[in-house]
Amino acid sequence: MEKSEQTNSFESSNNNNNNIDSNINNNLENNNNKNNNNNNNNNNNNNNNNNNIENSIDKNNKEDNSLVGVNSHRKHRTRLKSKKGNKHETKKEIDYKDLLIKLPHNAVSNFNSLENESSDNLTPPPPINSSPLPLPLSLPLPLSLPLPLPLPLPLPLPLPPNKENIEINMEDIIIPENKIKNKNNNNNIDINNNNNNNNEKQTSIIEMEDLDKLKQPKINEGSTGKKGKSHFFSFLQRGDKTNSSILKSSEQPTHKKTKTNINTPPDYPIHYFGHHKRFSSSSDEGSDNSKSQHSSVNTPTLSRHNIDSLPESQQSQKQSQQQSQQPQQQNKTKQIQQTILNNNNDNLNEVTPIKKSSLPTLEVSPIQSNIINNQTTEKHNSGGFTALTSASAMNHQNQRRYREHHQINHQQQQQQHHRHYHHHINSGGSSGSSDKFDYVSATGLSTKNGFNPKSLDVDHFPISDKRNNINIQAPSTPVQSRNYPLFTTQSPKNANSASKSKNKLKNLKRKIASSITGNNPSGISSSAFNHSFSSWNNNNSVYTGGNSGGGSGGGGSGGGGGGGGGGGGIGTPSSFLDDNNNLNNGENFKNSNSYNNNNGSNRSISHDEWLRQFYHKHLERYEKTKAVDYLIIKPWNFISWILRPSRIANYQSKILYRRAYILNFLNLVLFVVYLLSTILSSNEWFIFAPGILLSVIYFFLGKINNKMYLIAFLTISTAVAINITSIIYDLTHTRPTDKLIFSWDLLVMIMVPLLFPSIVYSIVILISVAVTYIGLGIYVQSSHNFYLLDAYDSFGELLRSIIIVFVILMFYTILSSVDLKEIERKESRIQSLFRISNEALVVHKDGLITDANPAFESMFQIKLQDLLYPIQSGIWEFLPALEGMFEPGASKLFDNPDMGVIETTGIDSSGRTFQVEVRTNKATYDGEPVDVISIIDITGRKQLMEADYALRKAEAANEAKVIFLTTVSHELRTPINGVLASADILERTTLDSTQKEFLNCIKLSGNYLLDLINDILDYSKIEAGKMEIIKYDFSILKMLDNSIRIVSKNIYEKGLDLCIFIDPNVPVIVNGDQRRIKQILLNFLSNSIKFTNHGQIIIRVKLESDDSTHSLIKFDVEDSGIGIKTEHLNQLFASFSQIDSGNSRKYQGTGLGLSISKRLCKMMGGDVKVKSEFGVGSTFSFTIPCGIPNTTTRFSLQSLGSAIYMGEDIQGINKPIGKKKYGASGVVGIVIDSNKYTRKSISQYFAILKISCVDFENKKEFENYLSTLATVDQTTNPQVYLVITSIIDINQLTTNGLPRDRIYHWILMESPNEERKLPLEFENRFVKPAQFADIVRCLYKIDSINFFIEQMAGSPYKASKDLQSGGSSNESGDGGRSLSGGGGGVGSNGNGNGGGGLDSNISPSELSSSEHQLISTPLSDVNEFEDINLINQSLSGLGPSAKVLNSTYFNGLSQSSKIYNNNNRNGVGIGNHHHDHYYQHRHHHSLPPEEIDYDESPFLFLNKPIRKVYHSQPSTPVTNGIALMDSSSKSPSIPSSSSASASALSPNSRHSNELGNGKTTQSFVFSPTSRKFSLNDSFNPSISTIVLPQVSYSPSMQGGNFPINMESVYKKIESHNNNFKRSESKPSTPTFLSNQPSPATSNSPQLLQSPTTSTTGSINLSPHRSPNIRLPLEVRSGSLSSLKPLREDEELESISDDHTSHLKGSSHSINQQIPSTIQQQQQQQQQQQQQQQQQQQQQQQQQQQQQQQQQQQQQKPQQQQQKPTTTTTTTSTQLPQNIEKTTTTTTTSTTKPTATSSSSSSSKTTKTQQQQHHPTTTTTTKSEKIEKTAAATTSEKIEKILLVEDNFVNVKIFSKLLKDSGYIFDVAHNGVEAVECVKKGAYDLILMDCQMPEMDGFEATTAIRELEKSNLIESPPSKKHSHVVIVALTANSGYKDKQKCLSVGMNDFLQKPIKTSDILIQMIKKHLN
């Protein structure tokens, strides 16, 4: 009795179980007693390792102790009785125990073994009214049984009605529904109920539909064999045990003495490796969050029905016991029930309820189930069995109580369930249920949403981990409660215990710690070892035992998450406190089963992955602890470092490397042994002392040396020597004894094979050692003083020898095993390489195949067995070409190492031939030399080679195409030149409306074709890698303005809006290739215009990133067009393609724009992106990295606006900002527009200028805003409002409610297409889209109209590549770079080419609808010439040149802005009728345009067309030296009949329209009202105006000439311009040109004055003429007195005399007359007469000389006959003043000088003189002008030109242009003829075509230069240059092409097509004037 009381809870549980078994079977009871007695000797082990067998027992229940004592006494008495059957029973017990323990860990094999079993052996379903069998609550079977149950049983053990309710804690197993027929469906096994009634053997997890398939097996209740076993145990024993490594690896140990089984604890180490991937669950659906077995692992109790199945003696005994305990049990039940209710049912077992359709049984409420279980458990501990009630009564009671409890807790559960579900991750036990799982089916789960687990693969359930709050648990089959009150199920709706999981988490941590360290605090079982299957060992009792921690709480709900209780007692309510004295209140029920917390992820993991996650995650924290770190990790690392060979050793063999560890370890051991021997053996210390030193030496040698064999030999030799020496010393110096102490002979001999893996070394050393020790033995034996004993009788010596031998042999075994594995791996690796090789490997002997790999079989379509059987096949059968190699005498070919690779044809078994590559090698196979042939199928390689050849061929063809496109650019451009130039010539003639219309079509088509050619050439350059990126400084604002003006008209013509958004942080001046950036932007804009029909187009400029060297600028072009589908985005940037054929037919274009743009962007280091939504719009973006400017400091738009606002100087701007127009008072911006983007854009500009702005959509919103303005004090400065509106109806007259105490300035913002005058209600206007410069000009008195666009520190163009290059560029949307302003083309859809001359057919509204616009012919490409100084430098050889007064508005223009008005590259040429919109509203300002832009370019002064100026009322007074118009000119709507100038300047005047139609040449603007000539000097910005003498102005003066004192004019110029120089002969009085002949030279300046009109104010102008005014800036020769006064005629006449010879190329001059007095005219006539006399004298002298020359020529006729017929000779005859000078050109072999009679010349001269006093002039053509008298002749042109051109169209065009200009020229058709002409005649200039047959221009130029060096050609006739000037006519505009022209000796170049004569004439005069 005392001994029983000392046992722990584990023994108590065993005793309780033994009590049950003793009532059933005495033999079983005896076995249990034996086990209990054995367990008494191992209490601690039982406490630590078997904690989960029993649930908590209340130690406070004192009456249970007596029962324990009785049970112990009973066991002791029956011990001997059961001894006989121990052997048999032990065997059964081992099987049973193994199965019970291993089944949950690897139960898959058991389940698989049942798949093929029939259902015949299954029991039928139990009766519905069968009574439950009450069993102890704290017995979670089967794992809870510590005792082995001998099978077969002597008596049938009653089973519960439902066999699955024999609790086996199958929570970790989900059985698929397709296995419902398997016998493993018995999930819950109670070992105490092995044999139940035959009618109650059906498992409750089998659904009703399967019950009819089950049969009742025959069971002999009295048998003791297998028939008496549980059917579940039967299937366990028949399971496929061999398939499970776990089942095979486990054997039940037996006690050494008693031979009985040792109870294997549940924490069997199978947990480390026994889990299968089937034990997993999905996270939401298909997973069992409830894990009911944790919450209701209640030990089954015996029911009355089960008792009835027992023998009568046992039945009576158990009934009496139950009846005796009934009152106590009822009292206990009431206490438990009250306790449970007081704790809010937190201790309820949360189990997934069974599907109601599964079995027709009654569910038991969780409360009642726990009460019953507790009652029965208490009764069981008391030793009695009590039947509580019948099945029907119990079912009825359970139903009622379950419904009551469900109704009470349903609402609360619904509120807390969501929170509890998320607490699953923090739970340490296993509890909780997903709300998706409502019922349990045979497969384990069924959900409310219809989820059926059988549709899932059981192998792919995710695994949860409870240890680290992560779910890695196995799915379980929930315990069901049908017909059995013990196995209660509960819906998750009744679970309320998840809110208190902190204590459970603490207990879980203690469990993990105890499992790792081996300690079990608070009775926690280590069997759970940190994974979810610990639930099998959790008893889940409602209460924990209060006294001791004997049994394991195992994560039990009431026990505080594992607080252990006593030996089976039911416990008291006080045990609700866990080990930390924290009240759990049953919360562990909620979280103990929280396996599934994967948050909806159905990820499946393999078994190995599960183990890795399981152990790695949970052991990681302990590995990182200091204790583990310092006690395990660091010591092990230190030991490993000591033993590990260093890197110096460098072992090449892993075998030797591993043995080096052992060698170093052995040396350390020897060191310790020698050291101890030296210390302990005082009389022999000198023998062992050397070993200390030697072992240390050997150790370090082993660390740093790889001579392992040598070191091992020395080590063994030293050990043997010292050992034998010590023995001999003992024999000779010590007292003889009767025995010999253990020697090292065996140890050393074992170490030999361990250290010497080589068999030779090992045998030799072993023999040596053996002989040595045998010799020692002989010596000892011969000494007769000692004798060797066969065995030692000392236990210590024996133990020591065994341990040493064991350790050494273990090392040897491990190393040998590792070596063997490595050898096997190498062999398998070689075999695998042979098998998996892609090369066909065949082994043959003399050509007969002996082996082949699978690649050979696959390649030749034959099996290996067919190759070898019935006879061996020959290799020649598959490789016929090798047959000769196997003939007799030819076998030596395989021995030739230089045989190399053979390419031949292989034949497979089907006869298919293919190309193979064969290599031969020698090898050894089965110990015999064989030949190995490797065969590679090179069919794919051959195909690849063919494809590569085709690719190379295609690339060559593509390169040929590129070369073709590049080289034939001349031929492509030549027809365009003929078309465009011819159209320009025809345009100058008188045409009717039809002719003009079709002529315009010709020009449009030609320019469009030129655009296509430009794209193709650009693409070909990119493909050929010849595209150049030239970087220079430029202004982003300027580039945007140029781009926008090109496309703005097309945008607004389609009804679209264009808006610009520029981020304030964008730098204004950057370094990059502006030309290419602009090309990309224009391509995107053109694309957006093409595909957008409504809405707007938005341009956004952003700064993506910025650093000290680069700025990444992003340009976005967003449209609201048709959009692009996602699948078509990849096709956008393909060359020559559009999205689909539909778009291709609808939209024009080559499909190259986007492709070129992307490639250009990539070349500049940027990128192109596109975002599009079909039907909504697209956004094309490109980023360009731009460098910092080289010419100025980098500044952003925001800093620019801030500087303007603060009045600070701006770096990079040459002129200061003017003051605010509206004083110091504040300004408020108001924007009114219907488009929100337009309003936002302008508001952004105001924000940059730090000015507040409001915007409104319509007039109503604006008036509402005005009504909110409060009246201010009149004494203060009135508020100024700048109202910008695009709605003309909103103005100062129509707007209601304007406060009168404020000032309003109204600005009209109009579309470029609107043709209307500026209404009086508005002060100014600008064109859409609004830009930053427009807002600044409206606010400030700036001194330049192009302030922000041209004043921005113009940077030098890095290479003057387009200098004087007329024609078209390679840029889409780009114009011809004509420096004389002609030949601009046009393209479709806004992609036209600018640079054209002024079109005579263009109305003034087409040119500009602004009253303030001044437009000049685009003489040069502003983009190409950012700094005009570079042009001056390139033309420095010309000397001082005349300056151009370009028409701009303000003085102080910077150098970079002088030619802005000439920039037509960015727009369509003015000569192009289709795209002249570029000049509409080009410049908008608020000041009267009365000043002249002074351009410093030395060659840009020729033929600048200009519109007459429209004057409008200025918005503010001008005080900067700029005179205002008088009242007669302020109103543009009132034409002035009293002033010809006013009439011409009026925008509504018909004359102004006619003036606008003509091409004008403007030098300055004269205002007759103010009598001022406005002049801007770039060298001296202080020049503001040139004030002319004031004269009376009246209608009576219309017919007279206004006198102009030119002396005063020149003084004014000289006073402000130091660089201005007059000629040596200064005029005394100014003279005006007239129609009379002028004796002045060709370089004399002229002042052309427009004629005054008649009283009607009308002037009849030629459609191709317009008035011009030229202000001379430099006089080369002659005097101003030679100038003749202008006069009026009905028609203006172009005067062609010596003074205007430099204007010959232009026919667009309009004579504007300035009145002069009669006195001045008389003075001029006198001066002219004097000059004429001088000229007559000179002419007479020349005639005489010519006559002499003619006589000499007549004397030498042979010389005349030798003149070439192809050379055109021109002879000029110098005639007297009254005789006309004519020039005749012939192409015959002789030259016939032609002269006109003196009378004819005299008559014409007289007529011309008479016409001076007539009020009208006559109009003549150019040819007539040349034939006129000397009045129409300026001077003799002695320059001679050679035209070298192979195209006859160009010959005609150029000849016409040269002839009209009065030049003498010859024609050569190729380079050979050009060289011949140069040898035979002298020329001043050669126009050399570069691309010609026979000899191109480059070769001809080289030849000509060589002739010049050799002095073989004559010098130029004009003597202006020392060598002939050669100008290239090239179709290529690349920088390298131009450099090539210059490198061969050409002086300049012109790019074809040359569209107008101005381009050619400008180039000629550039070099000849």
From Swiss-Prot:
Bias (Basic and acidic residues) ranges: 56-65
| One GO term (biological process) | cytokinin-activated signaling pathway
Asked if the keyword Disulfide bond belongs to this entry, the reply reads: no
* UniProt-annotated stretches for the region Disordered: 1-91, 218-335, 412-436, 468-505, 551-598, 1359-1415, 1521-1563, 1617-1709, 1755-1832
Biased composition range(s): Polar residues: 1-10, 242-252, 293-304, 469-492, 1554-1563, 1626-1665
Domain of life, per lineage: Eukaryota
Q: In what ranges is there compositional bias, type Basic residues? A: 72-86, 416-425
Cellular component aspect of the GO annotation: membrane
Provide the positions where the record notes the PTM 4-aspartylphosphate. D1889
Q: What is its EC number?
A: 2.7.13.3
PANTHER family per record: HYBRID SIGNAL TRANSDUCTION HISTIDINE KINASE B (PTHR43719:SF18), TWO-COMPONENT HISTIDINE KINASE (PTHR43719)
Q: What is this protein called?
A: Hybrid signal transduction histidine kinase B
Q: Which species is this record about?
A: Dictyostelium discoideum
Q: Which gene encodes it?
A: dhkB
